[in-house]
């Protein structure tokens, strides 16, 4: 029997890596499954900081499940097929642990599926450890905490669920870190954009959404200085246009998020800019506009785009 591969989404963020890493451990300890955690991309700088801090080896990167001899997969931090492994339609989805909308998803067989409207997939996995009476090792607690901090911007994002505060406190204690100090260090590690090329910058954290027949790419970068990112606008737009031509995106929306002041600048290019403007009730000026208080793609950008596109 081949191993069941456990992985997060393409262009993995910290929650994708952390939740899959922890769920792989839980699957073996609690459910007796023969699993292996892998990743659909290399860790970003924020995730690398967490991995190094807690002494965890990055999962190996794969592009195809069947190429690894696997016929079954478990998805964490995503469910939409266009965000998953290349041959997702050719293998059996054994299970899903996620905190996003469910869309573009169907299976031939019954599966284990747990989806909750909480701040991170890591939050769900942590509760599953408790429900099954499995002790959480320090390194796993640290990674789960990192996933939660990353996705909720240290519990400041509107996606933060009331239960996430207690989860963060408990994980910080298990990981033996100060929540605020470690959280800020983690987030700042992910804001070093100067060393990134424009192609890398628009792919750090990007997902594709099918909206009423349109392939809309929504990317996000975290920074402490929006103006510094906009200084590279011309080169960023060139990279976006190349990506649109190569991948067939109808529209590309880039969130440039200020993690200190909790605001974003939206840079958008594509065929449906009227729908983008209507979604956020703003007018793009030189392809960008300010979106006050917006820090969450999942709650403050994608639902609005979905409604505006009529998806």
Swiss-Prot record:
<feature type="binding site">
    <location>
        <position position="77"/>
    </location>
    <ligand>
        <name>Mn(2+) 2</name>
    </ligand>
</feature>
<dbReference type="InterPro" id="IPR038763">
    <property type="entry name" value="DHH_sf"/>
</dbReference>
<dbReference type="Pfam" id="PF01368">
    <property type="entry name" value="DHH"/>
</dbReference>
<dbReference type="InterPro" id="IPR001667">
    <property type="entry name" value="DDH_dom"/>
</dbReference>
<feature type="binding site">
    <location>
        <position position="9"/>
    </location>
    <ligand>
        <name>Mn(2+) 1</name>
    </ligand>
</feature>
<dbReference type="InterPro" id="IPR022934">
    <property type="entry name" value="Mn-dep_inorganic_PyrPase"/>
</dbReference>
<dbReference type="GO" id="GO:0005737">
    <property type="term" value="C:cytoplasm"/>
</dbReference>
<dbReference type="InterPro" id="IPR038222">
    <property type="entry name" value="DHHA2_dom_sf"/>
</dbReference>
<protein>
    <recommendedName>
        <fullName>Probable manganese-dependent inorganic pyrophosphatase</fullName>
        <ecNumber>3.6.1.1</ecNumber>
    </recommendedName>
</protein>
<dbReference type="InterPro" id="IPR004097">
    <property type="entry name" value="DHHA2"/>
</dbReference>
<feature type="binding site">
    <location>
        <position position="15"/>
    </location>
    <ligand>
        <name>Mn(2+) 2</name>
    </ligand>
</feature>
<keyword id="KW-0464">Manganese</keyword>
<comment type="similarity">
    <text>Belongs to the PPase class C family.</text>
</comment>
<feature type="binding site">
    <location>
        <position position="77"/>
    </location>
    <ligand>
        <name>Mn(2+) 1</name>
    </ligand>
</feature>
<feature type="binding site">
    <location>
        <position position="151"/>
    </location>
    <ligand>
        <name>Mn(2+) 2</name>
    </ligand>
</feature>
<keyword id="KW-0479">Metal-binding</keyword>
<feature type="binding site">
    <location>
        <position position="99"/>
    </location>
    <ligand>
        <name>Mn(2+) 2</name>
    </ligand>
</feature>
<dbReference type="Pfam" id="PF02833">
    <property type="entry name" value="DHHA2"/>
</dbReference>
<keyword id="KW-0378">Hydrolase</keyword>
<dbReference type="GO" id="GO:0004427">
    <property type="term" value="F:inorganic diphosphate phosphatase activity"/>
</dbReference>
<keyword id="KW-0963">Cytoplasm</keyword>
<dbReference type="GO" id="GO:0030145">
    <property type="term" value="F:manganese ion binding"/>
</dbReference>
<feature type="binding site">
    <location>
        <position position="13"/>
    </location>
    <ligand>
        <name>Mn(2+) 1</name>
    </ligand>
</feature>
<dbReference type="InterPro" id="IPR051319">
    <property type="entry name" value="Oligoribo/pAp-PDE_c-di-AMP_PDE"/>
</dbReference>
